[in-house]
Amino acid sequence: MPCAMELPSTPDELAAQQADSAALKDLLKDPSRWHSIPLLNYTPLHKLKDQTLVRFRGMIQDMMDPEIYLERYEVKSADGSKRVQEGKYRDCLKIANGEVIDYNADGNVHGERRTMFVVSVPGLNDWSKEHEKLCCPQIDLASLGQSPSSAKKRTIVGEEEAMDVDVASETTFKRPCLKEIQKDSEPVGASKSSVLGSDYLINSPLPDRPSMACMVKVYEEFDTYQLNSLVDFVGFLSVDASLDAATLEIDDCENLSELQAAHPSPFLIPRLHAFGVQVLPHANPLLDKSLRQPTEICEETYPTHLAVHKDLRMLLKLCLFDDDLAAEYLLSHLISTVYSRSEMQSIGKFALNLCNLPKNCEAYATKLYQILELLLPASHYMPMTLVTLNTAAFAPKKDYETNKLVSGVLQLAPHTHLVLDETCMQQGKLEANGVHAVQHLAHLINNQELKCDFQYYQIDYQANIPVLVLSEGRSMLPSDFVLPINADSKAVELVDESLKAAHHYLQPSRLQQFRKYLTTARTSGFNVSEEHTEMIQQDFVDMRKANVKSNADDLHGLLVLSRLLGIARGKDTLDKETWQLATEFEAKRRQRIQSLPKSSAQLRN
């Protein structure tokens, strides 16, 4: 039965609905309720009022220290009367002119909230951003009753409401009231030099592809949030100018850097007080029901799963020098995911090394990546040059001066495809940073874990980042599957024409099919019946008899490959045909490896 309740538009409305929190949670489960909420990722701040209902989508990049705040407090007026004011979902305590807060009142209630530092999805590809923006509701400034310029200054000149701002929390520091700020004729913060730059404060994992940042304050279920997870928050925007550390009384501040990192300008990094959240299973906006999809997307008809699979495999074959086996393995890689974990391994990962790339194909790796980024919601291309390895920050590192987890290029959201290009490597010396970079990459590939450096210790955080390595020889990095490309000589000559043809083939309607297919396949379930488990066990025994080198890793690889081959063909259960196809492909792959020079073939398969 549809819920008659509406989403609250102000913190006070939300406080009034708290008694029926179950109904509010049910309301938030309806994805259509999210459609009309402005998406902060694509809505300029000057179009939004303070305390507007908004949403923000991104990756949890850091989790800040707990904050104690006044959840409910008593206010005294000049005539001696008292009232109770709600402090939840606000940064600044709300009092009218002539009122004071009684900090010693018995009825005061303190609460705890946590701040999540969230960045827009690192590596989100252009087509994903454009589609999210297309789904974002347009804000009519007239409906807000103000012009853009007044919206930008609302917290500074908002005295028409006869409201003032006092202390956010007596346990932190005193914020000046709006009238005190207003007395200063200079722009806020103009007289104080900036300690930290905006790039450091925003903390984008991929500096050459900067993210937007938002500090999201959550009020419950703190333990359910995980670092690097994809989330979509709904709550109240907080852009009061007094939140900026540059406006604070800082004479007694021992660490100015930490103060500024914790309280950056809200116009650089807005705050959002969340009362609703959904963990996103993927970053593909085409399949997100909480986004209002364009009519043409909803009504478009699509061919069968098998037909799309056939077309996509043909496209990949065209891009891979007419190598059908390479197309099968690359497609399996593109739909792979870690679907289970044990103490010893991450099950389902499919790190792929496509090696033996022709040396005379200039910039082939970047051209192949340009095709892949059109298909994937999020991905990142990394040239494995000495400069990159020796200078880039790969793993997150805690900065105790600012109490921030400074991001690294490997801090990516789940299912962000990482493409490593070893074809651009040159001879030279790896410095200490380069050695650590290779170690971090190897650890990510082998364990699907990201090491975070807290200086005195390290913590492993779970990751789910498919890694594709493109190389001429065997990669220096480990992988689950190494596949030497068997390039057709004619296809090598025509590779540029083939890649141009691939771009021409990817018309908008076909792109939509491929994008939906890849995400749907990756999130599909797959089962192995008891009958086929016995078949697999017997086949493995036969394999061991025929080849003494076969081990448990080989069996695990076959299981992962057969699962992906089945899912790619629209199956949800393993059958004999798919299992035999996987064993056939693996036999061909191993035969290719044996044909490599001995120095390469002796390496781990």
UniProtKB/Swiss-Prot annotation:
Segment forming the signal sequence: none
Keyword Cell cycle: yes
Keywords: Cell cycle, Cell division, DNA replication, Mitosis, Nucleus, Phosphoprotein
Sites of Phosphoserine modification: 147, 150
Pfam family, one: MCM_bind
Principal cellular location given in the protein's record: nucleus
Taxonomy, superkingdom: Eukaryota
Any GO MF annotation of the entry: chromatin binding
Cellular component per GO, a single term: nucleus
GO terms classed as biological process: cell division; DNA-templated DNA replication
Keyword Repeat among UniProt keywords: no
Subcellular location: Nucleus
Family according to the record: Belongs to the MCMBP family.
Subunit structure and binding partners: Interacts with the MCM complex.
Job of this protein: Associated component of the MCM complex that acts as a regulator of DNA replication. Binds to the MCM complex during late S phase and may act by promoting the disassembly of the MCM complex from chromatin.
Protein name: Mini-chromosome maintenance complex-binding protein
Source organism per UniProt: Drosophila melanogaster
